[in-house]
Design a protein with these regions (language model features):
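Short, basic/aromatic recognition patches
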Residues: 2-23
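Residue-level signal for inorganic ion chemistry
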Residues: 13, 29, 61
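Short, basic and Ser/Thr-rich N-terminal targeting/leader segments
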Residues: 24-28, 83
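Short beta-strand scaffold segments in enzyme catalytic cores
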Residues: 28-34
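A cytosolic small-molecule/anion-sensing beta-strand core signal
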Residues: 34-35, 63
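Short, glycine-anchored, charge-dense loop/turn motifs used at functional sites
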Residues: 36-40
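Zn2+-dependent cytidine deaminase-like catalytic core
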Residues: 41-85
Length: 85
């Protein structure tokens, strides 16, 4: 059975995959979620849209986390999970 945070991560990643599909891209999404159920960042595959073979969903998600104004307050190594769907 999944925890609420895990379910949120999978649901958010799925929503991002659908977003990529509607944009004409590869339907893969990703979400970075804390153990207490906060979405830190999300992203979707942009390889087709940006014609960039490195624009994977997980990469877009991590880049999104790095663009947060409060990035320096985030401690991610042990307190977050990265989900992809």
């Amino acid at each position: 059975m999944l925890s609420a945070a895990e379910q949120l991560g999978l649901d958010t990643a799925y929503e991002q995959a659908v977003k990529s599909l509607y944009e004409g891209g590869i339907p893969i999404g990703s979400a970075l979620v804390t153990q207490d159920g906060r979405v830190v960042a999300k992203g979707h595959n942009l390889r087709v849209q940006c014609q960039d073979t490195t624009a994977h969903a997980e990469t877009a998600c991590i880049r999104s986390a790095g663009r947060r104004r409060d990035w320096h307050t985030l401690i991610l190594a042990r307190r977050c999970s990265l989900f992809a769907e």
